[in-house]
C-alpha cells in the first residue's frame, strides 16, 4: 500500500476571453457605412464587423492592396485622362453566415452607394470620382457605366479625369462587399450586359436602405467580429468572433472571443477601470486622464501602450466672409494663439504642435520632418507680429 500523501492540486486560474471596452462617446446604433452619420463608437463597431476592402491604409498610413481579399489590382491610363482599375477578388471569401463573397458583392456596394434611392434616403455620397456615377445617382441611367462586373471574381472601376491624378487615387479602386438582401430583399441581384453594372430582380427602396442601418440581430457581415447584441438604450454592444473571417491585410485574425463596448463616463472611467467594470480604455489624449491611468499602472495589475495619434486638432476659419476672409486677419489670430501653451495645458506634456494638416504619425511627415521644420511658418506666439501684419491691410 502506497502511503505517500497526495500532492495538493494547484488551482489553475482561468479568465474569460472577453474585453470590456470603455468608449467616451455614446452608441447611436447607425451602422450605415458613414453615409449618414459617423459617431466615433458607431464607426469602431462598423470597423470591427466590416472588412475585406480591396485597398486599405496600413499602420503607417500607406496604401496597400489587401492581399486577403484581392489577388491583383491592375490599372490602365485611358486616352481621355481617366484611369480604369481592374480588381480580381480571391476565391473562398464568405460572410459570417457562410454565404460566398464574389465580385458581385463588391459591385453591389457601388450600386447601392450611388443609387438615387440612397440619396433620397438622406445619404451624402459624392459622385464625382466614378465615370457615370453622377448620371446614375440622378436617376438618368439604369447602368453605372464606370463600374463593371467582368466575371464572378473580377470587377473594374473607371475614375474620372478630374480625380485620376489624386495622390490617393488607388483608394478609388477599393470597394467592400455589400450583402444585398440586407438592403433590398432576396430578389435583388447585380447584372452587367456590357454597358455597366446595374441592379435587377428586385427593388431598392428608401425604407429598405434606411432600415439596413439599424439591423443588429442576425446582421450578415464580413469583418473579424459579428454582432451578438446592441442596445442603444443601455449604450452597450456585444461582439463575438466571426468564425468565417479569413484575416486582415496581414492575415491576422482576432483572438479575443468577446468584445463588450460600454459608455465610459469622464468622471468615473478611472474608477470603473480600477474595479474591473471596464478593462480596456484607448485614445486617452488629455494629460489628467493619462496621468491617472499611469498611476494605476504604477500601482500594479495594469499595462499600457503609448502611440502617436494619426490625427490632429485645429482651429478653422470661415474664409469667404467677415474679417477672417482676409489672410492678414487669420495670420494675426495665429500669432496671438500660444499653441505650445495650449497643447501643454490640454495634453499635459503628452502632445505636440503641428503646423499644417498632418500628423507626426504619418509616414510622409516622418520622411520629410527636416523639410517641414525648415520651411513651414510656425506662427510662434508673437503679439507684435500680429499688429504688424494687421497694419498692412485696411478693413472697412
For each predicted feature, which ranges?
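N-terminal lobe/hinge region of extracytoplasmic solute-binding protein
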Residues: 22-78
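Extracellular/periplasmic solute-recognition and catalytic clefts
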Residues: 228-240, 260-321, 340, 344-346, ...
Amino acid at each position: 500500500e502506497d502511503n505517500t500523501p497526495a500532492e495538493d492540486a494547484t488551482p489553475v486560474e482561468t479568465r474569460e476571453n472577453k474585453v470590456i471596452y470603455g468608449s467616451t462617446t455614446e452608441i447611436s446604433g447607425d451602422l450605415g457605412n458613414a453615409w449618414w452619420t459617423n459617431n466615433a463608437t458607431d464607426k469602431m463597431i462598423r470597423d470591427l464587423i466590416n472588412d475585406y476592402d480591396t485597398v486599405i491604409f496600413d499602420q503607417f498610413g500607406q496604401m496597400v492592396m489587401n492581399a486577403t481579399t484581392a489577388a491583383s489590382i491592375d490599372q490602365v491610363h485611358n486616352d481621355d485622362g481617366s484611369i480604369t482599375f481592374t480588381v480580381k477578388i480571391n476565391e473562398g471569401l464568405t460572410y459570417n453566415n457562410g454565404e460566398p463573397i464574389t465580385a458581385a458583392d463588391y459591385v453591389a456596394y457601388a450600386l447601392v452607394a450611388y443609387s438615387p434611392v440612397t440619396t433620397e434616403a438622406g445619404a451624402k455620397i459624392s459622385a464625382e470620382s466614378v465615370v457615370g456615377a453622377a448620371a446614375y445617382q440622378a436617376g438618368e441611367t439604369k447602368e453605372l457605366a464606370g463600374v463593371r462586373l467582368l466575371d464572378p471574381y473580377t470587377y473594374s472601376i473607371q475614375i474620372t479625369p478630374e480625380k485620376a491624378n489624386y495622390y490617393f487615387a488607388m483608394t478609388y479602386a477599393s470597394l467592400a462587399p455589400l450583402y444585398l438582401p440586407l438592403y433590398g430583399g432576396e430578389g435583388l441581384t447585380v447584372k452587367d450586359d456590357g454597358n455597366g453594372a446595374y441592379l435587377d430582380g428586385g427593388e431598392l427602396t428608401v425604407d429598405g436602405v434606411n432600415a439596413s442601418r439599424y439591423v443588429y440581430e442576425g446582421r450578415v457581415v464580413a469583418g473579424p467580429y459579428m454582432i451578438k447584441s446592441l442596445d442603444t438604450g443601455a449604450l452597450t454592444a456585444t461582439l463575438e468572433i466571426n468564425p468565417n473571417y479569413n484575416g486582415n491585410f496581414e492575415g491576422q485574425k482576432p483572438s479575443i472571443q468577446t468584445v463588450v463596448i460600454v459608455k465610459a463616463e469622464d468622471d468615473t472611467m478611472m474608477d470603473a477601470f480600477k474595479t474591473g467594470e471596464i478593462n480596456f480604455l484607448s485614445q486617452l489624449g488629455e494629460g489628467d486622464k493619462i496621468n491617472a491611468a499611469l498611476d494605476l499602472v504604477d500601482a500594479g495589475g495594469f499595462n499600457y501602450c503609448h502611440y502617436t495619434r494619426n490625427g490632429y486638432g485645429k482651429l478653422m476659419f470661415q474664409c469667404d466672409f467677415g474679417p477672417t476672409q482676409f489672410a492678414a486677419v487669420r495670420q494675426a489670430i495665429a500669432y496671438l494663439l500660444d499653441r505650445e501653451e495650449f497643447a501643454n495645458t490640454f495634453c499635459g506634456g503628452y502632445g505636440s504642435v503641428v503646423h499644417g494638416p498632418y500628423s507626426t504619425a504619418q509616414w510622409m511627415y516622418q520622411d520629410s520632418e527636416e523639410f517641414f521644420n525648415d520651411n513651414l511658418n510656425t506662427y510662434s506666439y508673437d503679439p507684435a507680429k500680429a499688429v504688424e501684419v494687421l497694419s498692412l491691410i485696411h478693413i472697412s
